[in-house]
Amino acid sequence: MNRTILVPIDISDSELTQRVISHVEEEAKIDDAEVHFLTVIPSLPYYASLGLAYSAELPAMDDLKAEAKSQLEEIIKKFKLPTDRVHVHVEEGSPKDRILELAKKIPAHMIIIASHRPDITTYLLGSNAAAVVRHAECSVLVVR
């Protein structure tokens, strides 16, 4: 049975993406792993919390997802992986929740996630990577 690797990608942070490329490529070589890339876009209530009106200022969620998928597919081209082993997922909502849900669904043998070095807000609020490490049912590689 082939291993399955989940790689959450923040499409707005190319520096983090650069950090995980070599790790994903090396892990994917083992057993010709299937690699599932995921990006998560905030749900519409998040935008409303910023004071933006739903209809007047925001594109439709389907348009946001299509644009996010296009950006993620461009990012994936940087990885040297067989295209028949790559899967693309775009979800809406809380990144940590969507990562954990997809990890269970596919099911993932490993999650490779990039993370910034902790700062004061991380200690107060927690990070997505920390939540994934705490709650994932598979191995998690955090790349800093």
Curated annotation (Swiss-Prot):
CDD domains registered for this protein in UniProt: USP-like (cd00293)
GO molecular function, one term: ATP binding
GO biological process, one term: cell adhesion
PANTHER family the UniProt entry points to: STRESS RESPONSE PROTEIN NHAX, UNIVERSAL STRESS PROTEIN F
Family assignment from sequence similarity: Belongs to the universal stress protein A family.
Assembly behavior: Homodimer.
Protein name: Universal stress protein F
Organism: Escherichia coli (strain K12)
Lineage, highest ranks first: Bacteria, Pseudomonadati, Pseudomonadota, Gammaproteobacteria, Enterobacterales
